[in-house]
């Protein structure tokens, strides 16, 4: 190093001192070289080229000047023809010489000089090394023919009257017009102009042909009839239109030859132009063209972005979107990258839709296509994912990119996005409204297990209907069900409302009860003016404010309602079976609702968390007064309200102290420490103090911690909830959370078994290992052994989730084939099992629990067709599986996103009802079942008052189950067995026939294969009967009778029992005969106050948040959580 340093000479002192003062600037200035760029554009030629060609605005001006110059030359030619007076005679000299005045000649010479100079200049600027390419161009040749003779006449005066075919400048004007339009489109940045250009070219070609023909014939007939311009125009029009009257005809052979030549040119040129125009028109029809900017600025439109458009999706969107009166004038622009299929094209040609729906083929990722759709002027943009894709994650990624592209192009356009998988939701948090399909689906299926038909309830609420479905039906339940299906959620400010204005300063429950009693509306929630959070049933301690926004359920919104007082209504004498608007209550309802006599304190005490108790007063009080209901207080009395603190689990009061102690040691309440994906809403749940080892989560495999290998061995106190899914996706987490929410009583927690086709990953197991009684098993519903091991014989509900791998099929609606057949097998094998099925296509609901010869199902099918013909959005609602809540399709919830355009609160309310979101002070959805002890309440109005006065619950509907009045054809068919009843008397014979009818299900076929084989065996035994005697013959006869009486259901039951015995499972408790085939269930949303309460009715309730009444609710939530892994564990959350 010393040698190297010694080789570098030291700097002189002056440089060192200067560097100290000035730094390195001196050295940099000495080494700098000034470089000028784009020197090639500074030449004279390049400057001219920039002005005449490259610059868009200056080039456009040059083109416009050139076009005007050509038109002027044609105009001067017409003036010359009109001014001349040709001498009489037929000399050929009239063809070559014309009369041209001096001023006209001067103008034509000037125009020719300018045109020739401009043409030569542009040829020089566009010269690329081949001079002949510039000279032999047709525009250049025409310019030479029309300009050079005039320039020569300047130097040779005798040639001033020489004929020059100046009318050919029309073709140069056409060429200049095309260039001008191209420059104009470049200047205004318009690229989608092919159709306009082609139409312009066609029109200009026609005009040039006609103008050339007119001028040519007029000039050539100077030696003949001497036609004027008007006669020439008349002849050309008649000739080109193929009419040919013959009153004006050319006489000279030259003019005739010219006409033939022009017709030949027209036959060659025009078909080419028409062919190009037709091709562009067809392409335009495929791509959809452009949405007019003028219309976008003067009219309102929304854009629907989809990857592929199916007819079902289109009709769902159009029917729901245009169901609202204020949206009738909106246009819908569909932006889709694929071509329209035949069905969509046919629908969009219907006048009702063709005037309001515009289909554009394009991609949301292209700014040009977004510009075509005028996305920046749109009122909203709906972006839908394609759910019928094998790779749903890829479909979500496309949706995310579309949302990003729209937000980048039009940041002020409201976004309504549908996403499939919950782990992708956080990518589009910026969207105004987001519906995650799997979140809603699993939460809805979970609530179906504890609140029956929740999926049907939500589906009816988010569909727009007038409640006119089923009103033409002869059956009363269909009229009631159809009328109540028209109820929707609406909102209004309290001080502006006729329904709720009088309840300012009063409690929420008081307002809800009296509004329902007086107007028939169900107040379900409120929102403060200065708060964005919606509170469902905030409870009796919430005081209504004048600026509160009230959310209520009704047939129509208040603004569209008319009000009549009681006297007017009595005079009208209109008998209504349903209450909508003010109605006269029955006498017993009015007396009961007065609340003049209060019931005892124990009747207003807190219910058990398992459900409200509509118990009668005590025996002592019955002797004094009849049952009555306490009034709903205007302002809650703190001393009289006993809150249902579910944190202490009052539902467990019936348990022994030892059981209660063990239960408290086993469970805790808190927020789940792990979430399988980012963006899941934290929910207060029942949790374990310590997470379960992964090996213990496997239901059918023993481990070192337990030795159980089937569901029966665990000895669960409550029935199972089984979920059959293909994979343990992140959305399945939302199935578990609502069933383990903190407000669910511990005694009523059902064990959850996940029957998965594929093993779950570790992240999912990390999330579910903290929840009590959650297990999984690898198996399939195709395998009977797997079903028996997971405990299907004593399960309360079986949820069959649609498989992603079967969601797409080549034939429409065939995606559900495997699911439908598997569920039908379950339905046959386990008739007592409540099966809840998810389908891809709602149209396939008619195949659920299919019975080919069921007359009642056939009648419902006809009713569905009639409702569809009437234009109903809910034609499928009368299908018994849907009405009972046993089938669901996620596509039914697409209307939730569409309805949010008008009701921006619908997604929030639905998430609160399903338990996907929890807001402090907001209630939750639950249900209670009416028993025989509760029938004293009699009417829905009294039930409403009882719940509001006791615990603050708000009922919103009834799930009713009735016996099926119309028996099926199969249940009426029975085969007489009298010919085999030789050994029995008539009483036993009738007894056996009755048993046979009862044991035969309504869905079996007339002659099942198994029973046919059994009968054949019995006949063979009967033929061999004479060979036996005594007890042997009697035994054979008895076997023969028993075999015949066995129904298909009994055959299947025996098959199941044999498999259970083979697997070592106990057959105790297997009930093969208890089914629900002879009943029908349906929902009554917000029924009238005088609706009778019936036995086994299930009432939907919105129960107040029990934590809202605790003094320190938030600390209690946080402190009650078990000691689990801290924030570091969240870093392992799967993205």
UniProtKB/Swiss-Prot annotation:
Changing residue 270 to N: Does not affect channel activity. Constitutively open channel. Changing residue 240 to L: In DEE57; decreased protein abundance; loss of chloride-activated potassium channel activity; loss of potassium selectivity. Causes membrane hyperexcitability in primary neurons. The keyword Transmembrane helix applies. Changing residue 1031 to A: Does not affect KCNT2 channel activity. Changing residue 267 to H/N/T/E/Q/S: Constitutively open channel. One of its GO terms (molecular function) is outward rectifier potassium channel activity. This is Potassium channel subfamily T member 2. It comes from Homo sapiens (Human). The lineage of its organism: Eukaryota, Metazoa, Chordata, Craniata, Vertebrata. The gene is KCNT2.
